[in-house]
């Protein structure tokens, strides 16, 4: 909570907090909203989506960490697909509008499947910046994301 004002004073329009670091997640989300920012909540790979259920109507974004936070270049954790699918199903069932973002191990090899499962935003670090050809890597990733969207009709 003590970081909200410094971020908003710096011009932030979206603040994402980790569920695991907030003992009073609802209070933190409401604090962010009252400061005029959109709110996001992130979950680590071992955290169940079920823990977010009470807060989902209040957030603008859910960030699924698909690697353990801390350093780049880790492999995508396969159980993240089920989390994305479940978050998308809840969003549909409750007619909510939060975005689903995925960060960690995102590559052109899994981008299509991530979009098909319900992801809206993909964060690709190492797969782009360590590719040797950033422009080509971004183009390939974008193409795979668009293929996933086309598959969804």
Predicted segments, located by residue:
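Conserved anion-binding
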Residues: 2-6, 12-99
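Conserved, mostly hydrophobic/aromatic
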Residues: 7, 62, 87, 103, ...
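As written
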Residues: 10-12, 118-119
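A short hydrophobic/small-residue beta-strand
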Residues: 14, 39, 121-122, 128
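Expand to "…catalyze enediolate/carbanion chemistry for C-C bond making/breaking, isomerization
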Residues: 23, 27, 93, 107, ...
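C-terminal helical cap(s) of enzyme catalytic domains, especially alpha/beta-barrels
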Residues: 32, 115, 129-153
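Short Gly/Pro-enriched loop/turn and capping motifs at secondary-structure junctions
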Residues: 68-70, 105-108, 128-129
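Acidic, divalent-metal-coordinating active-site segment for phosphoryl/phosphodiester hydrolysis
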Residues: 105-117
